[in-house]
Amino acid sequence: MTTTAILPPDSSITSADPWIQAYCDPKAPEIFSSIITPADVWSPDPFDVETIHQEARERFAQVVDRVIQGRLSSRGAIQLLLGESGSGKTHLMRAFRNYVHSRNLGYCAYMQMTSQTNNYARYLLNNLVDSLEKRYDTSTHDTSTALARLSEALVDAIPSLTEEERQDLKSWDGDLSDAIVQYADRLTALDRFHRCDLELIRIFLHRYRDDYRVHNRVAMWLRCQNLTDQDRRFIGQATPHVDEADPLRMLCAIAQLIGAIQRVPLIFLIDQLEDLQNLEQPVEQFRRLVDTITTLTDQAPNTIVVLACLEDYYVAHRQQLPKSKLDRLENPFQSVRLMSQRSVEEICEIVKRRLRYLYEELGLGHPHDPLHPFTSQELEKAAKLRTRDILDQLRRHQERCRQAGRYLPFPPGDTPPPPPPP
């Protein structure tokens, strides 16, 4: 079935085929971008092909399930993702985040290792708070942030809380510090909250209030920033934690409270580990980061850390680590090597997903052949290339078609040479 495209056909496009018109239309959405930004990680991916890097996806899902079912040991999990540039590591991080949040399986923090720091616990903490303040699931109409969801779930757990008390906690403009102290005491009387940080529970209860001023001070307190007396007034005079060791303690306390509230993992998606080599003292930075994540997962059993980096970088730097740290990184969850070269079948799925998105955005029905205007024979020319190279080649092809105003055969001469064997 064919329908009229939402965008008017470009007068320079000579084909009467509506799908070719869409493909060649310079005003149509871009579908072959090979770059994923940190902001993209927080949105659904209409182009995701779940069969690509299937082993890594299955491993990740198994680790998440083991944490939820309480089948891990007394410490958290570390999963290494190794691959060459352009193999799809950041794309996979995005898929992991969407997998977890679309199924309400936990809370993810995403970060790239691009900043110099002497305290990686603080770096992780700042990125965690940034992540918790983002919308939890952008695939639904719910606009709640992760932090708002957690505070609401914590309030739901308060024993014998009346609806009137709940509404007062949400919207009353007076001082609720005494009430929050009482609610926190009720919570810590429950077995699941008995070991949680009492002051952190109170902070999460303050976060439930419908007051942006309170929300701002909660975020500052969670980041272990110093607070003025005026700031502390909004959060029940809570004492800020500003010692050098406090960020790591805060990370562990937040993970523990998340586990008590919803019995789900706190997941750190740490990307582009190889960027540490661009900083001063790169070997020392690498060691500090590994020390931080191993200590965190040792102390917080519901944490999962996914490390993605270039395989060459990791192989060159792993020898700088003591055996005890290597064992934590590589056991019991063995590193996953991401295959960078795509098969013809995978390439066809990549193209199908992107063409389908294009046609749906322009109000077109689906063509009989979901690869149209491509043929599988044309796409075979891109076999054994990296995902990034394939998308760049397709983007250049579409741009030429737009300039010509017609569909051009997929060009064999435009294929970059395949990467050397590993």
Task: Please state what every model-predicted region is.
Residues 125-128, 320-325, 408:
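Short secondary-structure boundary/capping segments
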Residues 1-77, 159, 170-171, 407-411, ...:
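A short, basic N-terminal segment
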Residues 142-187, 333-412:
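Conserved AAA+ ATPase small/helical "lid" subdomain
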Residues 72-263:
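P-loop NTPase nucleotide-binding core
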Residues 59, 63, 92-99, 120-131, ...:
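Alpha-helical scaffold elements adjacent to nucleotide-binding pockets in ATP/GTP-utilizing enzyme cores
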Residues 45-60, 88-89, 117-125, 242-250, ...:
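Phosphate/oxyanion-binding active-site loops and adjacent basic polyanion-contact surfaces
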Residues 2-32, 214-374:
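The catalytic "switch" region of P-loop NTPases
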